[in-house]
Amino acid sequence: MADHDEQSRTAQRQADKWLIAGSLLIGSAVLGIIGLPIFLRGVWLLRRAQRDGLSVRPMMVTLIGYLVVIDAAINAMGWSLDLIGNHSLLARVLLTGWGNMFDAGYFWHFNELWVGGAGGPGEKAWEVALILTVFTMRIAAGIGFLQMKRWGQQWMIVTCWMGVLIWCVYVFNMTMFADVRYAGVIFPVIGWWLYDIFYITPFLAIPYLHTVNREIFTD
């Protein structure tokens, strides 16, 4: 029994090393292509440990936890770049390129406001509010969830419902100012849905979070 527990802990640590490294790279947004195969290697190691009968973290908990952390990190990094580093070469290339292809709010009057960065209506309010609240809360909740803590599971529920609210309000914002956000871009509404579809992850996680056996999480 002790040998089984030790093998399980070793397998979990080995998988988490790859998963954490991949998540950090993907969460940086710029290095996401490098991070994805590293992350998938961690998923494969965890899957192999489960097939070998070892007691490791459930795959669904692992995927939801890491993907929530990655989602929050990508948004926090991208918006922080626009909020703080908007005059950097990286921002002026990536953000205006994004604006030219998908969302003209990141191209229209870029760096002409007193704050700098995106000039899309309401965008700066979203950036300040969500970086300081929801994204940091979701990263903390994801870490607690991956550690199988009950507070992590509870805060995952709270922040996922907040994600639903954010998604709905952001859709309204993009619709209300469609004449600014979609004017002259290469991929207008269709392009926006292509990348925005990934933001429905809170919708997908909520049923599991409400129905999972809470006894698997510890105080």
Whereabouts are the PLM-identified features?
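Topology signature of small-to-medium multi-pass alpha-helical membrane proteins
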Residues: 2-16, 27-219
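Membrane-interface alpha helices of multi-pass inner-membrane proteins
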Residues: 21-27
